[in-house]
């Protein structure tokens, strides 16, 4: 909210007790995130902002009943598209978990639809009961070694910096463009700097020497640390550390030990990519806070990491604290240790009471379906009969091995079965066939590879959620089932499909860009439940999420080996390699 003279005068009068506040929250224990202390006092709210803490009278009184009051939670790095929900539907889920503000990077929809994709996300996230700030996608496409739906140069992004909810440039992931002095990419960093905006990072696997080069450009945060050493190095060199706990990438338990009383204010908790069923049941960064506390972190420190730390990094001076002049985003907790949420106040209005949405305060007109009319449809070349054949002259091959609950893969060289000069799937060795089909420009590109770790016994899984270019990715035990799953995606204009034998046994349509559902969050949750149940039919019994794991096997900017529509890609050499070793 922009403040004007009348609003400022009114706030001053309430603070000075000349007029009553709109709302006063009484009888609570207030967590001061600046000092770490618990304070007593009334919280006086006017026009959505805190006017003062002390003894106040208001038109409306909310009694906290001696419960703990903390600032609304901030997720400092996430992708709305990964939730498969429209911003409107996502806000209904997040607000119940105390998340009142998110920093969203729309690089998924940006890779599919370019400028139209960013505009869709900005327009669809207007006037929600949470604040959605946008970090502009920095690398569309992620690399030049694949085909995305769009390309975004510095001049394409420049106009967006004037938007009040655009805060900066998101996860700059193309390290090679920095070290090779690629002026087109460097201009994006310069433009962000000239606009007084932030640049955050994405730098897995860099040595300390490479990290110096990376940070010298003005990139000051990273969420891609794979181990304690990398986390410490980033903190030592002045970066903010974003500790990630999502659906596929679960790094909090191993990285939280890095957080100390002296460095904790440089640390945040984020989700990055989390599926809707996990968000609904488990939670967002509220879950991360609970997990951090369970791992031994001081509760106050954990709360700071999703409030004031994030707000200060992103330059949101009126967010992340309970103090005069700050936005009245408040959580009333039954218990601090378990982060059990009783009430949520957004800009001073109680939108969640007793853990349930107050529907009368939650009036939202979801226009996402109409806004999505401008977005492109699936445009793939018809598959030929032998499209998934992998010809081999030797049985020694480069194999992608998935790492459960991680985005990293292992590069293995293994002996494989050959039948009539082509790779033959081995259920016994868990060596399955994988393909990435270009779906934006009907180029006919198909990248082929071998993957292990899914444990599929009979069937195929296909999806249009394939980071970051979001082509179609499919894995399976037979070409016929892979064909069936891919063609079903085309009929739905995107989504997830599981094939077994000659039929589709479960699917989830994602008609908005092949990434987002048009349905409500409870319906999407039910569809995902059916998909998960169908996994057992094709023999999958995994302790990780196969759908999101498959979606990240196509991201070449994460080690060690991935598959794009142009072929197998090795991170170490940052180049293509053949299937045959």
From Swiss-Prot:
Superkingdom of origin: Bacteria
GO molecular-function terms, A-Z: adenine deaminase activity
Database matches in Pfam families: Adenine_deam_C (PF13382), Amidohydro_1 (PF01979)
Protein name, UniProt field: Adenine deaminase
EC number(s) reported in the record: 3.5.4.2
InterPro entries, A to Z: Adenine_deam, Adenine_deam_C, Amidohydro-rel, Metal-dep_hydrolase_composite, Metal_Hydrolase
SUPFAM superfamilies the record matches: Composite domain of metallo-dependent hydrolases, Metallo-dependent hydrolases
Protein's UniProt keywords contain Flavoprotein: no
Listed cofactors: Mn(2+)
HAMAP family from the UniProt entry: Adenine_deamin
Record bears the keyword Acetylation: no
PANTHER family: ADENINE DEAMINASE, N-ACETYLGLUCOSAMINE-6-PHOSPHATE DEACETYLASE
Protein family according to the UniProt entry: Belongs to the metallo-dependent hydrolases superfamily. Adenine deaminase family.
Source species of the chain: Clostridium botulinum (strain Eklund 17B / Type B)
């Amino acid at each position: 909210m922009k403040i004007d003279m009348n609003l400022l005068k009114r706030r001053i009068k309430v603070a000075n007790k000349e007029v009553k506040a709109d709302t006063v929250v009484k009888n609570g224990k207030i967590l001061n995130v600046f000092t770490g202390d618990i304070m007593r006092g009334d919280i006086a709210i006017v026009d959505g902002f805190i006017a003062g803490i002390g003894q106040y009278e208001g038109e409306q009184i909310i009694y906290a009943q001696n419960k703990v009051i903390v600032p609304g939670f901030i997720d400092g790095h996430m992708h709305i598209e990964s939730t498969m929900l429209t911003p409107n539907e996502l806000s209904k889920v997040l607000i119940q978990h105390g998340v009142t503000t998110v920093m969203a990077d729309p690089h998924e929809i940006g890779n599919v639809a370019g400028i139209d994709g960013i505009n869709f996300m900005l327009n669809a996230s207007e006037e929600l009961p949470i604040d959605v700030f946008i970090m502009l996608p920095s690398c569309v496409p992620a690399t030049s070694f694949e085909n995305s739906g769009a390309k975004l140069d510095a001049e394409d992004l420049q106009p967006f910096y004037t938007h009040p909810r655009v805060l900066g440039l998101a996860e700059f992931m193309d390290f090679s463009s920095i070290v090779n002095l690629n002026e087109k990419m460097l201009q994006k960093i310069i433009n962000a700097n000239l606009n007084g905006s932030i640049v955050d990072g994405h730098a897995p696997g860099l040595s300390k020497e490479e990290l110096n080069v990376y940070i010298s450009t003005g990139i000051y945060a990273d969420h891609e640390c794979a181990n304690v050493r990398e986390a410490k190095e980033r903190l030592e060199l002045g970066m903010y550390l974003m500790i990630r706990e999502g659906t596929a990438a679960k790094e909090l338990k191993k990285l939280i030990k890095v957080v100390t009383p002296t460095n904790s204010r440089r640390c945040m908790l984020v989700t990055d990519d989390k599926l809707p069923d996990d968000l609904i049941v488990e939670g967002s960064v509220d879950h991360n806070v609970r997990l951090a506390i369970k791992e031994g972190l001081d509760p106050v420190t954990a709360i700071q990491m999703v409030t004031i730390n994030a707000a200060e990094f992103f330059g949101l001076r009126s967010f992340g604290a309970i103090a005069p002049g700050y936005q009245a985003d408040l959580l009333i907790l039954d218990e601090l240790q378990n982060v059990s949420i009783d009430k949520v106040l957004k800009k001073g209005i109680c939108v969640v009471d007793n853990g349930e949405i107050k529907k009368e305060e939650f009036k939202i007109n979801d226009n996402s379906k109409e806004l999505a009319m401008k977005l492109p449809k699936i445009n793939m070349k018809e598959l030929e009969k032998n499209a998934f054949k992998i010809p081999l002259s030797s049985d020694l091959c480069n194999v992608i091995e998935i790492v459960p609950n991680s985005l990293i893969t292992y590069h293995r060289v293994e002996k494989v079965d050959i039948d009539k000069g082509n790779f033959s799937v081995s259920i016994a060795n868990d060596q399955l066939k994988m393909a990435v089909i270009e779906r934006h420009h009907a180029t006919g590109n198909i990248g082929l590879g071998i993957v292990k770790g899914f444990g599929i016994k009979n069937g195929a899984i296909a999806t249009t959620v394939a980071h970051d270019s979001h082509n179609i990715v499919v894995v399976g035990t037979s070409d016929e089932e892979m064909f069936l799953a891919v063609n079903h995606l085309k009929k739905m204009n995107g989504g997830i499909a599981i094939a077994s034998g000659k039929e589709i046994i479960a699917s989830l349509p994602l008609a908005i860009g092949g990434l987002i559902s048009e349905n409500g969050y409870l319906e999407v949750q039910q569809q995902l439940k059916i998909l998960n149940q169908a996994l057992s039919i094709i023999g999958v019994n995994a302790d990780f999420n196969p759908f999101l794991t498959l979606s990240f096997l196509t991201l070449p900017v994460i080690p060690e080996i991935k598959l794009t529509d142009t072929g197998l890609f090795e991170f170490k050499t940052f180049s293509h390699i053949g299937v045959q070793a």
